């Protein structure tokens, strides 16, 4: 690990013009071979054990657990994305769920929402007390009933953490139907991958419902270290059986025919549990526009995967989501596109 202040482009990573320094815990840039990292800050000064500092996933879990579960299951069950939610989540028995499939929940495109003008409605869930439903029974009942149907599934992006909870229940029940009642999708499917990637034990568990069911959350509830973030990122950026085709390939913008649903037209998109930002090619010395996939979490958490195999991340808590300067800096250090 190298101090990020040694980089020539240091002022463009964790830039105070993008993220308030007093709300920034840690940020880092991996240049393909070396990890350049800031100090780890707390409200009471620098944290001396930066390597071991636990960082919250918040919605990174949607990408790391929901998307990864489907990517792993897809190898054995190629049609998994088209499974009907009502076949696996009895609590969503209302007619409005009839045509909703796993893929619609992963893409936040159930057709259920409060108001079409928002692309994210987690603020509405907070107002209604979604996160205060600690038992599976209460949480699934809330999630299945909170929004009404406004359009057919698959068309409109309406981001809801409650939809990821429903998906997690559906996936866990699907997994149990194939592997027995004692099977657990986090313990039996996700955890072996984390162990293979040599992640810290911080990742070995995820938040669960507080009851006998112990339903694993997929919407948030993981912890990790900066090293875990890098190892997961390296896995996403390499060619492997999960990233080359299918759920994860689309999520990582490898499929130019499948960019995802627009959150902000021509700028921000959502695809299979990952976000993507579209950058004008002209600004990056590229012949075509550049799509950068990233994971995002509540408070101001970003993990972005650049086309030159570099990676930028920051964990902050003032709801600031800006990182264009890091993209431009990375491109100057190692151009995204071959110059003509």
Predicted ranges, named:
Residues 56-80, 105, 167-171, 229-232, ...:
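Active-site SXXK
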Residues 138-157, 173-181, 203-309, 314-321:
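Penicillin-binding protein/beta-lactamase superfamily catalytic region
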Residues 46-54, 126-208, 220:
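Catalytic-site signature segments of enzymes, centered on catalytic residues
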Residues 325-340:
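Short, gly/Ser/Thr-rich active-site loops of penicillin-recognizing serine hydrolases
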Residues 4-49, 302-305:
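A short, well-structured edge-of-sheet supersecondary motif
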Residues 54-63, 67, 78, 95-99, ...:
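Solvent-exposed, acidic/flexible segments
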Residues 75-113, 146-148, 176-219, 241-242:
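Active-site helix/loop module of the DD-peptidase/beta-lactamase fold
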Residues 103-106, 168-172, 190, 194, ...:
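Non-transmembrane alpha-helical segments in soluble domains
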């Amino acid at each position: 690990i190298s101090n990020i202040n040694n980089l020539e482009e240091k002022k463009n990573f964790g830039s105070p013009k993008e993220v308030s320094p007093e709300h920034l815990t840690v940020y880092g840039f991996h240049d393909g071979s070396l990890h350049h990292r800031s100090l780890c800050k707390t409200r009471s000064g620098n944290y001396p054990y930066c390597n071991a500092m636990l960082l919250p996933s918040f919605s990174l879990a949607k990408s790391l657990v929901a998307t990864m579960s489907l990517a792993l299951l897809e190898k054995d069950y190629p049609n998994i994305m088209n499974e009907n939610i009502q076949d696996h989540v009895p609590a969503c028995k209302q007619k409005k769920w009839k045509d909703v499939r796993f893929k619609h929940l992963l893409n936040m495109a159930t057709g259920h929402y409060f108001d079409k003008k928002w692309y994210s409605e987690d603020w509405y869930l907070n107002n209604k007390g979604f996160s205060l439903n600690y038992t599976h029974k209460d949480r699934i009942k809330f999630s299945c009933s909170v929004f009404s149907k406004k359009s057919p599934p698959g068309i409109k992006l309406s981001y809801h953490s409650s939809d990821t909870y429903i998906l997690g229940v559906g996936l866990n029940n699907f997994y149990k139907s194939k592997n027995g009642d004692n099977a657990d999708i986090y313990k039996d499917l996700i955890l072996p991958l984390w162990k293979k990637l040599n992640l810290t034990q911080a990742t070995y568990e995820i938040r669960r419902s507080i009851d006998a069911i112990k339903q694993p959350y997929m919407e948030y509830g993981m912890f990790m270290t900066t090293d875990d973030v890098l190892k997961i990122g390296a896995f996403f950026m390499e060619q492997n059986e999960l990233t080359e085709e299918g759920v994860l390939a689309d999520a990582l913008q490898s499929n130019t025919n499948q960019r995802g649903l627009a959150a902000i037209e021509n700028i921000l998109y959502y695809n299979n549990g990952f976000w993507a930002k579209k950058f004008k090619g002209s600004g990056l010395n590229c012949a075509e526009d550049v799509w950068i996939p990233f994971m995002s979490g509540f408070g101001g958490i970003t993990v972005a995967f650049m086309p030159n195999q570099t990676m930028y991340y920051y964990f902050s808590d003032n709801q600031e989501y800006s990182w264009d300067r890091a993209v431009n800096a990375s491109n100057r250090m190692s151009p995204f596109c071959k110059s003509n």
